[in-house]
């Protein structure tokens, strides 16, 4: 493959990644913990869209439990978003040197 073909392919890959990123900005995933007591909705940009806390989970005598539930819900949302990114980028991820997460 000559250098011009390589540059053309690189530009095509960059354009595809930009389109996928634009699509991902519209995606939202939901992380859940405690059987639904805590839910966190995360945008494709990894920005938190919303947090739901069931009143049952809010016990001022057990704040560490609530903290653990929030952390678990966030981590669940991040894992789902990473999986979504991998699925959308697919083979482009390896061509672009991997994903930054």
Model regions: which residues?
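Long amphipathic alpha-helical segments used for membrane anchoring, targeting, substrate engagement
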Residues: 1-30, 79-101
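N-terminal intrinsically disordered, cationic/polar leader segments
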Residues: 26-57, 61
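Active-site- and interface-proximal helix/loop "cap" or "latch" segments in soluble metabolic
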Residues: 52, 56-83
């Amino acid at each position: 493959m000559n250098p011009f073909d390589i540059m053309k392919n690189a530009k095509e890959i960059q354009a595809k990644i930009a389109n996928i990123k634009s699509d991902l900005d519209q995606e939202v995933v939901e992380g859940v913990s405690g059987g639904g007591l805590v839910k966190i909705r995360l945008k494709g940009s990894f920005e938190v869209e919303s947090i739901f806390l069931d009143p049952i989970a809010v016990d001022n005598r057990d704040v560490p439990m609530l903290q653990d539930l929030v952390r678990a819900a966030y981590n669940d949302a991040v894992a789902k978003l990473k999986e979504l990114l991998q699925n959308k980028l697919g083979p482009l991820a390896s061509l672009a040197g991997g994903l930054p997460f």
